[in-house]
Amino acid sequence: MHLQSRLTALRRYPASTNQETQHMPKFSTLEIDKDLQNPRVARLLLNRPERLNAISEDMPGEIRAAVEWANADDEVHVILIEGAGKGFCGGYDLAGYAEQHIEHPCQQEKTPWDPMVDYACMKRYTEDFMTLWKSAKPTIAKVHGAAVAGGSDIALCCDLLVMAEDARIGYMPTRVWGCPTTAMWTFRLGPMRAKQMMFTGDVIDGRTAAEWGLATMAVPAQELDAAAMTLASRIAGVPRSHLAMHKMVVNQVMLNMGVEQTQMMATVFDGITRHNPEGLWFRRHAQEHGFKSAIEWRDSGRPIPEGDEARALIREIDARAGGRS
């Protein structure tokens, strides 16, 4: 997201913490407001339902701005994050990037890949998501449908996770063309389960997430909103200072374990996965056959072309594309 866009988003609400003068912010990718029944709960709605709430360039910075707004309001004690429409968040809005020949810090076609420009872009998004984790006020992700790929980054940066039993969570791009930059899986699941998720790119449902300890609870879909609000309201009865102190103590353990250093490595590796032979093959396949075909191959369990095989396939695809031009 461009700096000017982020500054514009931050200017949409005043810096004052006076509740009478602080207005509800307006965003292009999400909404935030206080719950009508319990104004101690701020409800942050990812609001791109026509794209399964996919992450656009504006969304990470708007999440940061919304969290900062909620933290500045003394009435708010807890932030509940949810998605409009059929699911929580389907990940980054990548179809256009994968299928088209465009110049972007995270996809450079005509010029050599600049890893530091790529890193700066993705690190900014990661830091935006991490405002949910760093927020002085507890954050709860309420997940229905799917929280996958980058959507799982948003969910796992929240302090607590409440899922519908049939909802799904996972990071499929670990098979090719991605590495979760927030690196939260190990801290939320432990090394063995995290490795299983990263090695397979599989998704799990809400029931399994609760059994594994990834989700705080999993409930039938029709009970999800009530369960999430019951938990949020229970938390909202605790003084803000106590919530902030307890959160700081737990977060400090993760900081001592190296969460920030791990995120730096994961963000570097994410850029590499998009520009190594395997990542370039994935993108060329999407450009020739469409993004849907590419992700169907990725998720099918078929071996991903690698190394020299991937390079040879890239040359073949480029030759066919040259013949059609």
Predicted regions and their residues:
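Conserved CoA-thioester-binding segment of acyl-CoA-metabolizing enzymes
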Residues: 4-84, 322-325
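Charged catalytic carboxylate motif
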Residues: 58-62, 124, 131, 227, ...
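Crotonase-fold acyl-CoA enzyme core
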Residues: 130-243
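Terminal peptide-recognition signature
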Residues: 44, 48, 62-63, 81, ...
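Short, active-site-adjacent cap segments at secondary-structure transitions
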Residues: 86-89, 148, 250-253
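C-terminal alpha-helix plus adjacent terminal tail
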Residues: 7-10, 18-40, 205-206, 226, ...
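Glycine- (often His-adjacent) and acidic-residue-rich active-site loop
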Residues: 83-127, 290-293
